[in-house]
């Protein structure tokens, strides 16, 4: 489902942002 894909994209972006903050 497109909604699930959008959620995965958002989660990945959020995780990457967190990694950037920790880096």
From Swiss-Prot:
<keyword id="KW-0413">Isomerase</keyword>
<keyword id="KW-0346">Stress response</keyword>
<keyword id="KW-0963">Cytoplasm</keyword>
<keyword id="KW-0547">Nucleotide-binding</keyword>
<protein>
    <recommendedName>
        <fullName>Chaperonin GroEL</fullName>
        <ecNumber>5.6.1.7</ecNumber>
    </recommendedName>
</protein>
<comment type="function">
    <text>Together with its co-chaperonin GroES, plays an essential role in assisting protein folding. The GroEL-GroES system forms a nano-cage that allows encapsulation of the non-native substrate proteins and provides a physical environment optimized to promote and accelerate protein folding.</text>
</comment>
<dbReference type="GO" id="GO:0016853">
    <property type="term" value="F:isomerase activity"/>
</dbReference>
<dbReference type="GO" id="GO:0005737">
    <property type="term" value="C:cytoplasm"/>
</dbReference>
<keyword id="KW-0067">ATP-binding</keyword>
<comment type="similarity">
    <text>Belongs to the chaperonin (HSP60) family.</text>
</comment>
<dbReference type="GO" id="GO:0005524">
    <property type="term" value="F:ATP binding"/>
</dbReference>
<comment type="subunit">
    <text>Forms a cylinder of 14 subunits composed of two heptameric rings stacked back-to-back. Interacts with the co-chaperonin GroES.</text>
</comment>
<keyword id="KW-0143">Chaperone</keyword>
């Amino acid at each position: 489902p497109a909604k699930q894909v959008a959620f995965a994209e958002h989660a990945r972006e959020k995780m990457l942002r967190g990694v950037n903050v920790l880096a």
